[in-house]
């Protein structure tokens, strides 16, 4: 009589490439819950939660989306989250201070200057990481997107607060601003910093270092130009146009880097998968000393194949009969 063994049910995990959907749905539900509570109670204590969740849903979703595309990345979730938090805070503080000093000295703030200051400030944390690690360009792109998303989230919170105060507490202007910036955010700071960081992290891997630096400065100049164009248009249609172009460039670079990282030459058909497989022979054909050494890995590495045993693919010596035939 046989008894059936009950196996525990296997949990079906959502593919890594689709986890961003969970983040988006969860974040949207949280925003709707906070918004409903604010409307129902008219309690201003819900306003900070509304601004925080509304400004962070799309940036966190976009970071998760790009992180899911990088299967062989060396970055953990904690590292990416820390880069987003530190890069966002330090970037906004440094950029805001420099822009304030520039306005005080020059009396105005050109859009090109804004782009140069903010894009340089956002590269502070990735540049520090690059000094003590050697990540790949794809990891640099993910880090750049994380830093840019953190910067954009904090900036959106500031703009939403200004809109709330300027409108006398009306939520329509706040929700409209959050919606527009959320739609355009993946093609804004996240895309610009991601492109710049990918070019920065690719310098070490360049065969000619000068070419890597030249490529970085060209990409950085293009990023500043996109940023300046974004600020000069100052309209919803302009944001969507520049954001769409920036997002397309980011996706093209991501696809290229992911393809370049994932491409590996296949193994030869006759090559063993394990580096020591060529030493593993049936016990009847192996020297007794080799059997003992194979049972202790460090002995096999230290002494190699003992005398008297031959590799499995080595040709067998000719017999005496064949040798005598060849001599005649």
Language-model features: where?
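Hydrophobic alpha-helical segments at protein termini of multi-pass membrane proteins
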Residues: 1-316, 320-328
């Amino acid at each position: 009589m046989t008894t059936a063994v009950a196996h525990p049910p296997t949990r079906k995990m959502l593919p890594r490439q689709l986890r961003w959907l969970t983040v988006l749905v969860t974040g949207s539900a949280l925003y709707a819950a906070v918004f409903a509570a604010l409307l129902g109670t008219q309690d201003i204590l819900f306003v900070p939660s509304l601004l925080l969740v509304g400004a962070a849903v799309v940036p966190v979703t976009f970071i998760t989306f790009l992180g899911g595309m990088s299967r062989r990345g060396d970055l953990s979730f904690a590292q990416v989250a820390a880069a987003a938090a530190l890069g966002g805070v330090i970037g906004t503080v440094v950029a805001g201070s420099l822009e304030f000093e520039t306005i005080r000295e020059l009396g105005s703030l050109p859009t090109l200057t804004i782009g140069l200051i903010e894009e340089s400030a956002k590269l502070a944390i990735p540049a520090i990481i690059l000094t003590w690690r050697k990540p790949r360009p794809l990891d640099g792109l993910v880090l750049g997107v994380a830093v840019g998303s953190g910067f954009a989230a904090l900036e959106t919170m500031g703009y939403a607060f200004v809109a709330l105060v300027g409108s006398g507490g009306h939520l329509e202007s706040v929700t409209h601003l959050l919606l527009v910036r959320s739609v355009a955010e993946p093609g804004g700071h996240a895309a610009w910093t991601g492109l710049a960081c990918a070019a920065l992290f690719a310098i070490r891997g360049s065969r000619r270092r000068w070419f890597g630096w030249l490529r970085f400065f060209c990409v950085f100049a293009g990023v500043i130009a996109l940023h300046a164009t974004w600020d000069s248009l100052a309209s919803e249609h302009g944001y969507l146009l520049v954001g769409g172009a920036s997002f397309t460039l980011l996706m093209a670079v991501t696809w290229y880097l992911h393809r370049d990282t994932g491409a590996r030459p296949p193994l030869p058909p006759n090559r063993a998968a394990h580096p020591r497989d060529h030493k593993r022979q049936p016990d009847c054909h192996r020297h007794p000393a080799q059997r003992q050494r194979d049972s202790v890995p460090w002995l096999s590495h230290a002494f190699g194949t003992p005398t008297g045993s031959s590799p499995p693919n080595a040709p067998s010596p000719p017999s005496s009969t064949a040798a005598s035939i060849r001599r005649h």
